[in-house]
């Protein structure tokens, strides 16, 4: 996970703004480039960039009121999820707002055929030279010394004052952050003779050393239950960073661990040029982990692997980086694709095992994408995210130029409209796994649905870690599942994988099972889960009171760079909600009794 430690840059550019720029207003400004990123040259003026412009809603509370109305048990609209057309009507800006923005673009040199009005978003393509004139900025090529990735970016951009109140953000401009699979980097071939192991050895008792579907079924009370094949209970799995789910590996996995599911498969949703190449040399561990446990735990459900392009090959000529590598923003591509699907094609559950430190992303970007998760929630999608694998933090310092010691919340796990999944390990007792991320958002205030649970934890915590986190921020994770040493087939071999990236798909499959249970009784799918979990559903989870997370060791676990050290930094598992396992792990039978 890249950490932003800022270094000063482009001060002379800021000081040399022409007076004609005074009619413009700055939308976003970074003091300097992120840690590990350095400027390597000016951007090619002819390079074409595809931009996303998010229109600021005149009444942002309307979306939030709607998602809580359809997601909070007891309210009159509970379960009455919106159709896509109803959501479009809710979000559509005034005609004059869109026309004003489009007029600015065309008058500034953007060709009309390069503009696409999508209601609350406007997409436009133009070259760097035109973009610089439009946004009163200068684009440069920045290189990340850790990954060798290069991107065309800027540190500040502006729009005319006359439309500034309508522009929430334009990207890619100031977005340097890079998604990472939420695994704890424990990837090792399993030496156990799997063929010689009996079915009993794959049971809950063996979760101590190896997690399989049989282990999870017994531990979480699923038994032999499978979902029914129906169009209104689909599961989506997010794929990024050229991770491709392999059909052959899934078949090997099912043959060994879920023989009754052999022959079941998944479909593909390829977004913005995304692929799902079979048999290639690239990494497939994360994708295989996700698909094998989602299909294995709910094999009759319709499962789709949504593969979104967003990072191409390395660029040999850094002054002219490859467009596909540097300027395609995969979260926005995926989310905009999903919210435009007809309701009968939407997944009821979406599992994603990727994230980044919250502070490494522009504030406008986290707000805009979090709102897109809320939009999915209004249409009945349970959005599941892994909480991360850095405990309270990895670098444990701010990126505002002050380098202050601070815990690092993870996004999108910190968005209040997703359900964040922490990690556990072992049985009898099941306990928090040390890498499970959690904490409190520095961007999003604590939602009301969390108040009672989180205030109770903060009272127990007292002054410990005071000043290192925001006690009024959205707290995460919400719940947890096993996260250590999952048996996964990858490239034909068994591998052990650890991380909350494993916890998320396991939980997604269990939520799909709960949806199946409700649909069989004539009730709608659960949709956005958190208001139910925090009001009543928590009693269907097993409270985890042993173990805790750890972090802030003095070195960033991804870059290896020296960082802040906080002795004994940890969130402990406690009675009730805590920021390492949330309310705990699922008990399927108990959950069926507290469903709305």
From Swiss-Prot:
SMART domains named in the record: Pro-kuma_activ
Keyword Calcium appears in the UniProt entry: yes
Pro-sequence residue ranges: 18-203
Location of the active site: 286 (charge relay system), 290 (charge relay system), 501 (charge relay system)
The keyword Secreted belongs to this UniProt entry's keyword annotation: yes
Pfam family name, one: Peptidase_S8
Residues bearing carbohydrate: 265, 403, 572
Positions of Ca(2+) binding: 543-544, 576, 578
One MF annotation (Gene Ontology) recorded for this entry: tripeptidyl-peptidase activity
Cofactor binding mode and count: Binds 1 Ca(2+) ion per subunit.
Cross-referenced SUPFAM superfamilies: Protease propeptides/inhibitors, Subtilisin-like
Keywords from the named record: Calcium, Glycoprotein, Hydrolase, Metal-binding, Protease, Secreted, Serine protease, Signal, Virulence, Zymogen
Cellular component, GO annotation: extracellular region
Name the UniProt record assigns to this protein: Tripeptidyl-peptidase SED2
């Amino acid at each position: 996970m890249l950490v932003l430690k800022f270094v000063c840059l482009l001060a002379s550019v800021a000081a040399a703004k022409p007076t004609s720029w005074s009619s413009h207003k700055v939308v976003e400004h970074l003091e300097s480039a992120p840690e590990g990123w350095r400027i390597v040259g000016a951007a090619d003026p002819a390079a074409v960039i595809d931009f996303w412009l998010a229109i600021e809603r005149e009444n942002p509370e309307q979306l939030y009121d709607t998602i809580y109305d359809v997601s909070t048990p007891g309210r009159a609209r509970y379960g009455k999820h919106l159709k896509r057309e109803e959501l479009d009507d809710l979000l559509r800006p005034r005609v004059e707002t869109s026309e004003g923005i489009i007029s600015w673009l065309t008058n500034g040199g953007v060709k009309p055929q390069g503009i696409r009005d999508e209601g609350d978003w406007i997409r436009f393509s133009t070259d760097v030279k035109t973009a610089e004139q439009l946004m009163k900025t200068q684009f440069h090529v920045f290189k990340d010394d850790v990954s060798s990735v290069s991107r065309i970016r800027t540190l500040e951009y502006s729009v005319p004052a006359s439309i500034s109140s309508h522009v929430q953000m334009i990207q890619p401009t100031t977005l340097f952050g890079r998604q990472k699979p939420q695994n704890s980097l424990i990837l090792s071939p399993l030496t156990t003779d799997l063929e010689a192991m009996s079915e009993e050895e794959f049971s809950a008792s063996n979760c101590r050393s190896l997690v399989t579907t049989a282990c999870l079924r017994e531990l979480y009370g699923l038994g032999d239950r499978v979902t029914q094949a129906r169009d209104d209970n689909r599961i989506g799995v997010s794929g990024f960073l050229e991770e491709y789910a392999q059909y052959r590996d899934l078949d090997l996995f099912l043959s060994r661990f879920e023989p009754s599911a052999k022959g079941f498969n998944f479909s593909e949703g390829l977004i913005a040029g995304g692929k799902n190449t079979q048999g290639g040399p690239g990494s497939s561990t994360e994708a295989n982990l996700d698909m094998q446990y989602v299909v294995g735990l709910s094999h009759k459900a319709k499962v789709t692997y949504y593969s979104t392009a967003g990072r191409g090959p390395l660029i040999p000529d850094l002054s002219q980086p490859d467009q596909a590598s540097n300027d395609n923003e995969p979260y926005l591509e995926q989310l905009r694709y999903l919210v435009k699907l007809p309701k009968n094609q939407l997944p009821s559950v979406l599992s994603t095992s990727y994230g980044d430190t919250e502070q490494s992303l522009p504030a406008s970007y986290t707000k805009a994408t979090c709102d897109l998760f809320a939009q999915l929630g209004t249409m009945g999608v349970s959005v599941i995210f892994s909480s991360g694998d850095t405990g309270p933090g990895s670098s444990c310092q701010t990126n505002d130029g002050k380098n202050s010691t601070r815990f690092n919340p993870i996004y999108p796990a910190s968005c209040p409209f997703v359900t964040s999944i922490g990690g556990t390990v072992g049985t009898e007792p099941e306990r928090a796994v040390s890498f499970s991320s959690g904490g409190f958002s520095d961007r999003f205030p604590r939602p009301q649905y969390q108040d009672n649970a989180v205030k109770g934890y903060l009272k127990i915590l007292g002054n410990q870690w005071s000043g290192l986190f925001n006690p009024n921020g959205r707290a995460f994770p919400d719940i947890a599942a096993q996260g250590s040493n999952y048996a996964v087939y990858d490239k034909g071999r068994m591998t052990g994988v650890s991380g909350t990236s494993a916890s998320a798909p396991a939980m997604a499959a269990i939520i799909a099972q709960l949806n199946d249970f409700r649909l069989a009784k004539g009730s709608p799918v659960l949709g956005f889960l958190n208001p139910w979990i925090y009001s009543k559903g928590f009693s269907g989870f097993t409270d985890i009171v042993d173990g805790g997370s750890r972090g802030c060791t003095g070195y960033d676990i991804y870059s290896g760079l020296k960082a802040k050290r906080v002795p004994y930094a940890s969130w402990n598992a406690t009675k009730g909600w805590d920021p390492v396992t949330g309310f705990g792990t699922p008990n399927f039978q108990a959950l069926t009794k507290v469903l709305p």
